[in-house]
Regions:
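Active-site-adjacent scaffolding segments
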Residues: 6-8, 16
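Long, charge-rich alpha-helical interaction segments
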Residues: 84-127
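Glycine- and acidic-residue-rich phosphate-binding/metal-coordinating active-site segment common to enzymes
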Residues: 14-97
Length: 127
């Protein structure tokens, strides 16, 4: 049973599985290391797959056990009313401050893009 209330990658869904942040096929010595087992939802786990770094050795996904998230806002939302229904539409977007380290900024952007989080947040907000 996964003990966290929400997926550590998206923060929306209940975790139903564990992701091996470092793939167990490539790093069998870390296969059961608790810090390598990330409680996550099936959607994030399937989107992430076995990937964790680019061909240039840059990490693709945040690991909230190790990465220090900047203490500045980088996720924003715009609410708009476009018709007489009075139902707002939402538009989530990233705006990374120059004060955020370039490598971390790149990883944050990649994390949100690879997991399709901005679109998933919009879908979730419009339910």
């Amino acid at each position: 049973m996964v003990l966290r209330a929400k997926c550590i990658y998206c923060g929306m869904n209940s975790p139903g599985t564990f992701d091996h942040y470092l793939p167990k096929e490539d790093y069998p010595e870390f296969a059961v290391l608790s810090m390598n087992l990330i409680p996550c939802c099936e959607k994030c786990n399937s989107k992430k797959g076995k990937r964790w770094k680019t061909d240039a050795d840059s990490r693709i996904f945040l690991n909230l056990y190790y990465d220090l998230i900047p203490n500045v806002q980088f996720l924003f939302v715009t609410l708009a009313y476009h018709d007489q229904s009075h139902v707002p539409t939402v538009d989530f977007y990233l705006q990374l401050a120059d004060s955020i380290d370039a490598n971390l900024s790149s990883m944050i952007t990649s994390h949100y893009e690879q997991l399709n989080l901005l679109n998933r947040f919009e879908d979730h907000a419009n339910k």
